[in-house]
Amino acid sequence: MLISMDPLETPHSCIELTKALGEKGVINFSQVEHIIMKYNRSVKEVFQLFDLIRILTTDHAILTRITREVIEDFASENVVYLELRTTPKRNDAIGMTKGSYFEAVLEGLRSVTSVDVNFIPHDKEDSRTLFSPNNGSSRKRIYVRLLLSIDRRETTEAAMETVKLALEMKQFGVVGIDLSGNPLVGDWNTYLPALKFARNQGLYVSLHCGEIPNPKEIHQMLDFKPERIGHAICFEKEHWEILKSSKIPVEICLTSNIRTLTVRSIQVHHFVGLYKTKHPVVLCTDDSGVFSTCLSKEYKIAADAFVFTGLGKRESFELSRNAVELIFAERQVKEDLTKYFDSVAKTMGVYKNKIHSYEL
């Protein structure tokens, strides 16, 4: 479930943070302002923006703020389960290690006050679940779980360091490993040892797959059989056959794919073919700030564009409910969410609650 944590809830919030670093001499603001404000960006421009985000998120205080704001934003639109993807980074100039980076994320989780957040695995808490009748809270509630991302620019050793950090932090809601970053760089065999180790140690694995034409790597990724893949755009016939036979769930990011021009138009998006054949899919935002979207908007885009597939209110609700089986959280969370969705289905004429995944 592609949700990336980034400082771009709006272009203005990114400009605010960038200006602050510009005043400190860390960034030349005039060189990046136009990239922030641009609406449609090419793949190359998107990764230029990600380079800026990388700088912004190598600051503990900013990272804590972003984490808090991302959770509050998704909770405000009735998201009840959120997987946050975040790439642990180093910044020797300020003493940031991958470990201290993660601690800043944790501080952001703990600092949320507007909503009840559950990020500790269920077996570490009492028997009450977040949506159980005896919970005793009338406030908005949200489950949050974390995926630590391996950046494609990293070495095998750096990738392994991220996996080991994920294992150390499982008690704080880390459920898996993600492979992401600029698809134009790196080689699959660089990350494979770390990904195999992660799987052998019980972590789930999600891969950004097929963002650009790379038939060999796509085949290698599908052969690895990750628990989920994101995008699946530049697939050839052979890749589609492998994907559909393996039933690997796909994270669909409509706005992201259109604005990076990797899909020609919404009408020809591969979501239709996957949905009609009942392949496991889930709608996601990718980087919601980068692409100026939110989960509600992604569902509306799908409903408006694919009405001919019969994707009405009930089907959209079922699409979100079915995503419960695709999340990386523990069994008790899945059971709690399923009961909650069933309760909503019985009591509300309009279905309002969603499942989602995001990145920092």
Q: What do the predicted segments below correspond to?
A:
Residues 1-203, 211-217, 221-228, 233-360:
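Metal-cofactor-binding active-site regions of metalloenzymes
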